[in-house]
UniProtKB/Swiss-Prot annotation:
Keywords: Cell membrane, Heme, Iron, Membrane, Metal-binding, Oxidoreductase, Transmembrane, Transmembrane helix. One of its GO terms (molecular function) is protoporphyrinogen oxidase activity. It comes from Helicobacter pylori (strain ATCC 700392 / 26695). GO terms for biological process: protoporphyrinogen IX biosynthetic process. The lineage of its organism: Bacteria, Pseudomonadati, Campylobacterota, Epsilonproteobacteria, Campylobacterales. This is Protoporphyrinogen IX oxidase. GO terms for cellular component: plasma membrane.
């Protein structure tokens, strides 16, 4: 990856852009689940929300997740000494794995809502919506402060 050495900061900038896009989608998608669950009895409304869920997941969240992973891996390949910079990186990567699990669980929620919109109530999705915020806060603290 020597040919990319001079581009580390560019890759990092695109990584930040991708993360922002991914997080925006993960913040909004469960809010759509809330609307979906609250209005399960309104077929037309549910139809519109389902389209929004699918488009947000397929055209924003998933590509942003992929680009986040690609640029993150590229940064580690360009600068492998990051692995030796402290335990903060390993903790961050563990939290990223949780974000990935959350991302794919959102897809499962979409399928469940499509089959049975009354399976979980809106309150569940409101609480569920907090997870990416908490993970993001922890990741940002680890990356900026590098506490260990």
């Amino acid at each position: 990856m020597g040919f990319l050495n001079g581009y580390f900061l560019w890759v990092k900038a695109f990584h930040v852009i991708a993360v922002i896009s991914w997080m925006a989608a993960l913040f909004y998608l469960p809010r759509l689940f809330v609307y979906h669950a609250e209005n399960a009895h309104k077929k037309e409304f549910v139809g519109v929300v389902q389209i929004q869920e699918k488009k947000l997941y397929s055209f924003i969240a998933s590509p942003a997740m992929g680009f986040t992973l690609i640029t993150g891996i590229l940064m580690l390949l360009i600068e492998p000494t990051l692995f030796k910079s402290g335990g903060w990186l390993h903790a961050k990567l563990a939290l990223v794995v949780l974000l990935l699990a959350y991302h794919f669980y959102c897809k499962k929620c979409m399928r469940e809502l499509e089959k049975d919109p009354t399976r979980r109530n809106a309150r569940f999705y409101r609480v569920f919506n907090e997870a990416p915020t908490i993970l993001m806060i922890l990741i940002v603290i680890l990356v900026v402060v590098k506490p260990f």
